[in-house]
C-alpha cells in the first residue's frame, strides 16, 4: 500500500514565474539567475510601471508548506543505505530521493530496502536498466 503524507494546508505559490535578472536577455554574458539591481538610475530597482518585479520577502512561501513537494512530502537526499534508516520514523513527512551519482546496482538495493521499510522514493524507477541475456 502506498504511503500517504501527513495532512497539510493547500500549497499556494504566490508567484510561479521565475525572477529573471535585469537585461539578461540583451547580453549573452549575463546569466538569467536573479541578481538585485543596484544602479542609481535602474528602473527595475526604482519600481517603474511596466518593468519586471523584484524578488522580495512578500513572495515567500507559507511557512507551513515551505519545501513541500506537490505530493505532500519533503525531500531527503539518500546517499547510502544508512540514510534510509533515518527516514523510517519520518516516512509520512519525508520522502527519499536517491542521489544522482549512485550506481545502478546500489540503487536497485536501495529501492528494494525502501519498499521493505515503507519509505517513499521520488525517483525509484529512474536510471534502471534491464540487462538482456544473449
Swiss-Prot record:
<dbReference type="GO" id="GO:0022625">
    <property type="term" value="C:cytosolic large ribosomal subunit"/>
</dbReference>
<dbReference type="InterPro" id="IPR001515">
    <property type="entry name" value="Ribosomal_eL32"/>
</dbReference>
<dbReference type="GO" id="GO:0006412">
    <property type="term" value="P:translation"/>
</dbReference>
<comment type="similarity">
    <text>Belongs to the eukaryotic ribosomal protein eL32 family.</text>
</comment>
<dbReference type="GO" id="GO:0003735">
    <property type="term" value="F:structural constituent of ribosome"/>
</dbReference>
<dbReference type="InterPro" id="IPR036351">
    <property type="entry name" value="Ribosomal_eL32_sf"/>
</dbReference>
<dbReference type="Pfam" id="PF01655">
    <property type="entry name" value="Ribosomal_L32e"/>
</dbReference>
<protein>
    <recommendedName>
        <fullName>Large ribosomal subunit protein eL32</fullName>
    </recommendedName>
</protein>
<keyword id="KW-0687">Ribonucleoprotein</keyword>
<keyword id="KW-0689">Ribosomal protein</keyword>
Amino acid at each position: 500500500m502506498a504511503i500517504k503524507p501527513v495532512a497539510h494546508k493547500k500549497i499556494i505559490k504566490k508567484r510561479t514565474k521565475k525572477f529573471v535578472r535585469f537585461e539578461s536577455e540583451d547580453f549573452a554574458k549575463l546569466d538569467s539567475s536573479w541578481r538585485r539591481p543596484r544602479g542609481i538610475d535602474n528602473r527595475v530597482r526604482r519600481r517603474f510601471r511596466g518593468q519586471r518585479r523584484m524578488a522580495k520577502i512578500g513572495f515567500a512561501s507559507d511557512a507551513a508548506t515551505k519545501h513541500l513537494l506537490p505530493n505532500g512530502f519533503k525531500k531527503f537526499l539518500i546517499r547510502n543505505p544508512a540514510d534510509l534508516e533515518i527516514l523510517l520514523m519520518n516516512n509520512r513527512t519525508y520522502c527519499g530521493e536517491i542521489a544522482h551519482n549512485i550506481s545502478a546496482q546500489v540503487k536497485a538495493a536501495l529501492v528494494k530496502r525502501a519498499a521493505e521499510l515503507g519509505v517513499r522514493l521520488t525517483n525509484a524507477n529512474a536510471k534502471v536498466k534491464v540487462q538482456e541475456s544473449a
